[in-house]
Amino acid sequence: MRYEAGAEEEFEAACGLLVDRLVRWAGGQGTPVDAFMAEAALDYRHRATVDGRLGLWEPRHVEELLLHWFPQQVTEFPGEEPGDGPGTLRTLLRFLHAVRLADPRGPALDGSLGAVDAAEEWYPEAMADRDRWGLAKFWAVTAAEQGVDVMDGAALQRFAERAQRGEVAYDQRALDEIMDRRLKGRVPVDGARAEPQLPVVLPSDSELRRPAEASTTVAQLRSLAEWAGREGRLVTAAGRLRMADARELVDVLGTGDRTEGVRSSNDLPRLGLLVEWAKKARLVRVAKGRLYAVAKARPVLADPLQLWSRAFDALFELRQALIGARSGWHVESMLFDVYDEMLEDVLNTLYSLPCPMPWPRLRDSVHLSYRAHFQLDAGSDLRQRMWFEHADRDLRAMFDVLVDMGAVEREQGMADPAFLETDLSDAEDFGPELPAGLPQELTELLGVMGAAADPAEARERDRRLREELTAGPVELIRLTELGTRAVRQRLLAVGRDAPLVGELVQAAPAGLLGALAEEYDPDTARTELAGWISARRDRAAALRQLTDAVRTMAGAAFRTRAQAMLDVLAVAWPDGEGERLLRALRDDAVLAPLALSALAQRDLLSPEDMTDAEHLLVLAESLLQLVELAGGPGGAGEALRAQGPEARDAVAAALDSAHPDRAGLEELRHLAARAWGTSAVRHGGVRGRGRSTGRGGRKRRR
């Protein structure tokens, strides 16, 4: 489960529904739950994590929620009963697994619960630690401690005015720490979300060892370590290779450096890069005046894929060796100042793209990022052109290294039309809101633009770019399979979602269909589903498991998710038999409303072909899903009224249908009664701006 960072209404509705269902489930289990804390936990995953997956809770998420987000965001006033953050999180985790909303790529339930146990010991101390509080929470509690009624807006305003005049006592040290943490980015914050990635297809590691072994860089680094050996080679007092050894090594490694007339190994750039690379990859080290092979690196040197991967990660530390100034007479380019960040963004841009990136588009996108990072207005047009050309040469050098090691491949060809559809001429005028339709991950390069450029100049740049892309073949850049694997590993390491076709082969049916519905395009969904079915051998049994998963999800009162699961099953079912599957479910006691809705949405079933009873089933299903999309009971009344006066008759007709979700229809009846001002028994309704769950006045403060 994931909602886009800007889709606040959709998230709020989904959060309301989840909390409503959670409280009902917990009540049935006899398990206490704090609805406000549960809402705050979901807020954390949506707003403050890079992937935003509500159903995936790794130990790092558990720890950050309990020891950082709750202390920062959840305000508990003096005399108020504290909320049970760890207990609520345990209940939420059990609920997600029980109703099959847990992400199949996350840890097992026991692993997540163990992380809660580990953090719980420190939770009370963290909640009381003012250094961890948010700024608004700090002042709210300070006001409450001094007798201010924080629910009285006027009283709180008077307190704020006194604080500004220096008439309020407060913990200056704690406030300084809070401000320092905010300024240095050491707090979980809103807006941490990164763009989702498309699923990728990769060979097995055993297959990838062959291209890794063929990598020029792997061969050179291995040879360098073997040359250094266990006995080591003498180096100068500055830690550099002696010139005689450097000449020998140039020949051994085939670096192509010209040694004639060179007096220092420092003047052999390609050799210097490889030596520094081997150091950063922990393959060699300098100690006591000698260059040694690292003994612990022997297993890495023996495995080409491990060696290649270590070299790839070390590349992010090679800024000076790769593009640094060679002497005091030279200066670094703009790329030097943002090297590691730009390398990451460029690779993320190339990752999972369905077609190769044209060099001119990538180059100009990087230029936009430079404009965001640097004040370029002071330079003349000629000087700016020189700055960009210098940075372009360094970017080329970076790509040369990526090509040599086998992470990137280049070819000549026509740019895909997708790269002609996005007008970047006004990109510098955009703030955090970037233009829609950018190639996936290209937003990472653009970031937040700086001051607006001359619109005419920007349009002229875009015109020149289009001419360049359409005039003929251009250089096209894409990641190799090795490069894709390496970038994916880095994405996963920082918590980003990077789906891999085949990774769901052991997933439970509900987890499989949920992931396919949310993250996979039709082609990769078909491939993933085919692999899942193949692993079970019995196709008929596999279909029963999948349809049972949809049936269970519908029974758990998550009908919109059940609909999405059935839809993706129909689209991805092998041999194009999805329509036959839906028609077979037309008479299913539980799934008929979902199947009929799917057939109707695809224009595979006309209104004339449906019976009166089926019309009522589809009508009832649409209303039940409307209630869910509105956030459950909390927002459904307004949603029903928004449908207009004919909605009364529609609800009345739906209530007379044979829809299998009788509990849902009963809830719909009560919601409709409240929506149109008649008396009814209230059911559910735990989330909302007015609370009835004993949250004790706790507020989120940002």
Residue ranges and their predicted role:
Residues 34-55, 59-71, 164-273, 291, ...:
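Short, amphipathic alpha-helical interface elements at domain boundaries
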Residues 138-141, 145, 152-181, 651-657, ...:
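Charge-dense, extended regions
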Residues 103-118, 272-274, 281, 285-333, ...:
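Accessory beta->alpha helical hairpin/"wing" motif in late/C-terminal subdomains of nucleic-acid enzymes
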Residues 212, 414-578, 589-685:
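Long, compositionally biased intrinsically disordered terminal regions
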Residues 20-127:
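N-terminal core-binding DNA-recognition domain of tyrosine recombinases/integrases
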Residues 100-164:
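Extended, non-catalytic subsegments within catalytic or DNA/protein-binding/adaptor domains
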